[in-house]
UniProtKB/Swiss-Prot annotation:
Belongs to the MoaC family. The keyword Secreted does not apply. It comes from the Bacteria. Catalyzes the conversion of (8S)-3',8-cyclo-7,8-dihydroguanosine 5'-triphosphate to cyclic pyranopterin monophosphate (cPMP). Disulfide bonds: none annotated. Keywords: Lyase, Molybdenum cofactor biosynthesis. The gene is moaC. Substrate binds at residues 76-78, 114-115. It catalyses: (8S)-3',8-cyclo-7,8-dihydroguanosine 5'-triphosphate = cyclic pyranopterin phosphate + diphosphate. Pathway: Cofactor biosynthesis; molybdopterin biosynthesis. Its EC number is 4.6.1.17. This is Cyclic pyranopterin monophosphate synthase.
Amino acid sequence: MTSNLTHLNEKGEAHMVDVGGKAVTKRTARARSYVNMTAETLAVVANGDVAKGDVFATARIAGIQAAKKCADLIPLCHPLMLTRVTVDITIEANANRLCIEAQCELDGKTGVEMEALTACSVAALTVYDMCKALDKGIVISDTRLISKTGGKSGDWFYSE
């Protein structure tokens, strides 16, 4: 059972994977989250009228910062020298939600999936924090990996 779970040793104990012998390759990962809210709250966000400030700029910076701190938050993640982190937030007015997409890149020995997922998650939590006075019913949903490239396991793309 543990042979496919790289974070478990032969005794079933959690450990950080040794990536020392792996080749350095270009690696990317893209993740997505949605933040669902009332139409009224979305209008306030879109107009830039949230009392706490610019929701988009604050969430974007929070997501970037979170990607850089991923190894401090998730115990078995390796500290990485990210070469690029982007966080894009778009309004989907027809669905009363924001779509948050994060992309992380590096030239390294391990992937950046957790960094992209963490960036999306923290950006979404930041939107919630900034808007909770307007709407207690905000829902963060469908956080998922959209794609990953590079590494021994190759490329992967989510399909709906």
